[in-house]
Amino acid sequence: MPHSMSRAETLAPIHVVGGGLAGTEAAWQIAQLGVPVILSEMRPVRQSPAHHTDQLGELVCSNSFGALASDRAAGLLKEELRQLGSLVIATADRHAVPAGGALAVDRARFSQALTEAIANHPLITLRREEVTGIPEGIAVLCTGPLTSEPLAKALQAFTGLEYLSFFDASSPIVTGDSLNRAVVFQASRYDKGEAAYLNCPMTEAEYERFCQALVEAEQVPLKDFEKEERKFFEGCLPIEEMARRGKDTLRFGPLKPVGLVDPRTGSRPYAVVQLRQEDRAGKLWNLVGFQTNLKWGEQQRVFRLIPGLEAAEFVRFGVMHRNTFLNSPQLLLPTLQFRRRPTLLAAGQLVGTEGYACAVAGGWLAGQNAARLALGLPLITLPPETMMGSLFQFISSADPKHFQPMPANFGLLPELEGQKVRSKQERYARYRDRALAALAATGLVRQAQTA
């Protein structure tokens, strides 16, 4: 559906706040559907502590969008976006640099190209201004992990204080089918209620070896602005810091074994690591109390010392950093609309997704649906078999009590029908084929190709 100036003149502009990856994608998708857009970006009027330029879509961390191969979760997500006509992914493809099996970009040329595309679109007005309140009318919030204080306060007032977080302290998540079920047992303490936890029992020797590895592992250094804002770290001690406080700190804390019996021995273990179910299907499991600041490679090495986790597949590593994000299961629909105000949408890291491609995906969906609201067209909810559909289904329906940001991963997708596929490579290839077929069946790919 190409843009039309004559039709656009009769429509009120949609306001997109934030010129990162999500906001840039949202603005482009809205304009491509023929609806005028105001894109507000506060840089350079007000600089964030992490950005260095005034360019749109500036990559403040790595220059990599993750795996290229479409039989990897990040690669499948990008392939879906390619087929749906994503500006950001097309720009990344054009400015790619050699990076093995990943899509990495020349970050300066990439953000320059995005800025020029937005500035030159006849239906997009780029405003360099700080937005301090929630806009009226149809609007999309894409303000990212470092949302400015005035707008964050406005969001708190709109959503309720308890539904906006300023600090991300996430524990790692592993896949259920990668656990050693000969060691791991399912039980709740004192057999109370449902056996909702998986338990990894430790002997004294295993516990001591784990604690030693934990305190010796390499940590991620805090950014300067995170050091200055230590209040975000209070009351949420990394597990490696707890281990440094003494031999018994962990086993009287998150690793306490009370009320649990190892069925292999018939007695209480010396310590226990508990895993909590993260999704309805029981495919993803969270290491309870394992918020950590260890480097990702170190997390994999150290946490695989836990009995039962020797071959654990990590779909998300633990992080501790400054991150403004919504309690999306409480607030958002799978269309990325706010439940209490359907003309307001959100996308990017603000909604609790992790990674560049996930931010782009949110921008695509929020932009499409904002434009469709303006045009009186049916809104899009993507099929759960697609990576995009499963991601936004998850963030809008996860347990709000334990919600933490989530990256794209195959654990979010529905199980394959028929006989269980043991080969991981074949299973992922089938996930990919099913996802792309489901996406094609929506007709959205055909629309993107003719736009």
Swiss-Prot record:
Q: Name one GO biological process term.
A: tRNA wobble uridine modification
Q: Which cysteines are joined by disulfide bonds?
A: none
Q: Which GO terms describe its cellular component?
A: cytosol
Q: Which family does it belong to?
A: Belongs to the MnmG family. TrmFO subfamily.
Matches recorded under PANTHER family? GLUCOSE INHIBITED DIVISION PROTEIN A, METHYLENETETRAHYDROFOLATE--TRNA-(URACIL-5-)-METHYLTRANSFERASE TRMFO
Tell me the HAMAP family matching this sequence: TrmFO
Q: What is the designated name of this protein?
A: Methylenetetrahydrofolate--tRNA-(uracil-5-)-methyltransferase TrmFO
Protein's organism: Synechococcus sp. (strain JA-3-3Ab) (Cyanobacteria bacterium Yellowstone A-Prime)
